[in-house]
Amino acid sequence: MHSPLTLPSQGFGLGLRTVHYEEIVATRPPVDWFEILTENYLVAGGKPLHWLDRIRADYPVAMHGVSLSIGSTDPLDMDYLRAVKILAERVSPLWISDHLCWTGIAGRNLHDLLPIPYTEGALRHLVPRIEAAQEFLGCRIVLENVSSYVSYKESELTEWEFLAELARRADCLILLDVNNIYVSAYNHGFDADEFLAGIPIERVQQIHLAGHSNCGDFIIDTHDAPVIDPVWELYARAIQRFGPVSSMIERDDHIPPLSELLSELDQARAVANRALCREAA
């Protein structure tokens, strides 16, 4: 069923946002690929799909969802998965990703990406759900580590141990969100480099970079600001460990002009290139 574990690096991408549609089509900026928010394109017809078709003609796209709720105790939402599959057949995505989390229970959506307990029981619950989703979609799914603000007393493993074991058992891939690692390390007091060291190199398909909000005692993953220096430094160490992984910039609020995001993407290229040169030296 599956191809080799991960695709070769696709370079450096941006999250596709509505305010930039026209400029992207008109100017064809130097972006290697775009990541789309899956849920924005699940309704047939309308402007979002019109613009996506035009942009897809010039750029590869990856699909990134927020509604799979793979960690929920509710049954998998097959209507949602069918809609995802229809969109995938239309756009031929590089890969399909979502989050290692739960978003609701008993049919109610909490509109947040909530962490799960890192236990053997949770692994046994998640693996068949991931396998079923992958079988239905016909591809490995790529699961992202979420930022977290609470933890469970029941947890038996670290987050990175859990993620590594889950990827192995379910034969899925990992979207490594470097900002989320930084946020969770700050909030819970663990070593971000230990997280990186615990993730299997062969499972990392993509890296996310984003900004956050520092509230003093804790920080929140808000995607509303540029990437800060400590996150760039963590990204450099991630590239040294995992190699030239496909990387992209997320911005979901206070979205700046496209030119500013292109400058930030150039910074990602520069950081990655320096990290690879240091690793090769």
Predicted segment positions?
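C-terminal helical cap(s) of enzyme catalytic domains, especially alpha/beta-barrels
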Residues: 258-280
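Acidic (Asp/Glu)-rich catalytic clusters
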Residues: 23-29, 46-63, 79-94, 133-136, ...
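Acidic-and-aromatic substrate-binding clefts and catalytic sites of carbohydrate-active enzymes
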Residues: 22, 38-50, 69-78, 149-154, ...
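Active-site acidic/histidine proton-transfer and metal-coordination neighborhood
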Residues: 77-174
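Gly/Pro-rich active-site loop or hairpin
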Residues: 45, 75, 113-117, 123, ...
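Conserved, mostly hydrophobic/aromatic
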Residues: 34, 96, 141, 177, ...
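Boundary/entry segment of secreted carbohydrate-active catalytic domains
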Residues: 1-24
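Distinct, well-ordered alpha-helical segments
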Residues: 21-25, 152-168, 184-197, 259-262
